[in-house]
Amino acid sequence: MIAIGLEGSANKLGVGIMLHPEDGSTPRVLANIRHTYVSPPGEGFLPKDTARHHRSWVVKLVKRALREARISVRDVDCICFTKGPGMGAPLQSVAVAARMLSLLWGKELVGVNHCVGHIEMGRLITGSTNPVVLYVSGGNTQVIAYSSQRYRIFGETLDIAVGNCLDRFARTLHISNDPAPGYNIEQLAKKGKQLVDLPYTVKGMDCSFSGILAAIDGLAASYGLNGEEKEEEGAGDDSKPTRADLCFSLQETVFSMLVEITERAMAHVGSKEVLIVGGVGCNERLQEMMGIMARDRGGSVHATDERFCIDNGIMIAQAGLLAYKTGFRTPLKESTCTQRFRTDDVFVKWRD
């Protein structure tokens, strides 16, 4: 079976084509194409602008994916799209494209939960069996474990997502959004040496990032670092934190919180595996810190590279095809988007 997946819940538009061989052998990625809407430094991406980007690129990416996969429309069994969670306008633009292709090609639709897509793609690529999942991105921060055909949320952010915290601080510093603000924060943090004290907020298996963001924004303003970088920054005063120091401190603090709640979930469910998914999961420092914790517990950490960590269409095709093979379909009249589509709302029929 072959599925085409369309992802557009935020600023990345992805089209992926996945093959599940009839003999039950390992699924194959036939195409995985992505195009990103990049806003100017110091600015986020507005839903209307992002949706306009997706509408203008989706047909081009679908055609390119079909060429790369070397298949025709006749070979496609179903069209999978992100039903939620995500930003309303971008989600809607991709859902409209999926409906159009469904009607044009006469193919059935499968609405996919974005978070479940990340989990299933991570499981496929890494070969992890039943891990505790840390899902970290610009819009979500959740600690998840599978039980009784649901991906249960054991802990999550109480306010903003960790990726949103990092992205918004990048705006404060006027760091470039190309290729991604979080990536540029990570590169700057590697140069940091001074650890600045920041709030640390963990409640059980939940955490909060808004207070940390407010605190570090205030520090950046007090040291004159909130704006475009000046040539004289960091010169002459070794006691004054630099941009790199602030990025380093922010990463160390928020990642320590994530490691703590993940370890607590591992102890609760008795797992020795951690799977990190979502865009922030690409961060090498997060993977390193999580690895130290897991090794101390006699466990292991699984993560993917940017092809599969960052939002992509192939994860939607993978999760959609798993659901499609169990008989799941999304009727045209129900092919709407749900911005707050919870991970544990999905009945995971394809797992025991």
From Swiss-Prot:
Keywords in alphabetical order: Activator, Acyltransferase, Cytoplasm, Metal-binding, Nucleus, Transcription, Transcription regulation, Transferase, tRNA processing
Q: Name one GO molecular function term.
A: N(6)-L-threonylcarbamoyladenine synthase activity
The answer to keyword 4Fe-4S applying to this record is no
Q: Where in the cell is it found?
A: Cytoplasm; Nucleus
Pfam families in alphabetical order: TsaD
Under which main EC class is this enzyme filed?
A: transferase
How is the subunit organization of this protein annotated in UniProt?
Component of the EKC/KEOPS complex composed of at least bud32, cgi121, gon7, kae1 and pcc1; the whole complex dimerizes.
Q: What is this protein called?
A: tRNA N6-adenosine threonylcarbamoyltransferase
Its recorded reaction(s) are: L-threonylcarbamoyladenylate + adenosine(37) in tRNA = N(6)-L-threonylcarbamoyladenosine(37) in tRNA + AMP + H(+)
What does the cofactor field's note say? Binds 1 divalent metal cation per subunit.
Q: Name the job this protein performs.
A: Component of the EKC/KEOPS complex that is required for the formation of a threonylcarbamoyl group on adenosine at position 37 (t(6)A37) in tRNAs that read codons beginning with adenine. The complex is probably involved in the transfer of the threonylcarbamoyl moiety of threonylcarbamoyl-AMP (TC-AMP) to the N6 group of A37. Kae1 likely plays a direct catalytic role in this reaction, but requires other protein(s) of the complex to fulfill this activity. The EKC/KEOPS complex also promotes both telomere uncapping and telomere elongation.
Organism encoding this protein: Aspergillus fumigatus (strain ATCC MYA-4609 / CBS 101355 / FGSC A1100 / Af293)
Taxonomic lineage of this organism? Answer: Eukaryota, Fungi, Dikarya, Ascomycota, Pezizomycotina
Where on the tree of life does the source sit, at the highest rank? Eukaryota
- In this chain, a divalent metal cation is annotated as bound at H114, H118, Y135, D311
GO terms for cellular component: chromatin; cytoplasm; EKC/KEOPS complex; nucleus
Question: Which family does the entry's similarity section mention?
Answer: Belongs to the KAE1 / TsaD family.
Q: Where does substrate bind?
A: Y135, V136, S137, G138, G139, D167, G182, E186, N283
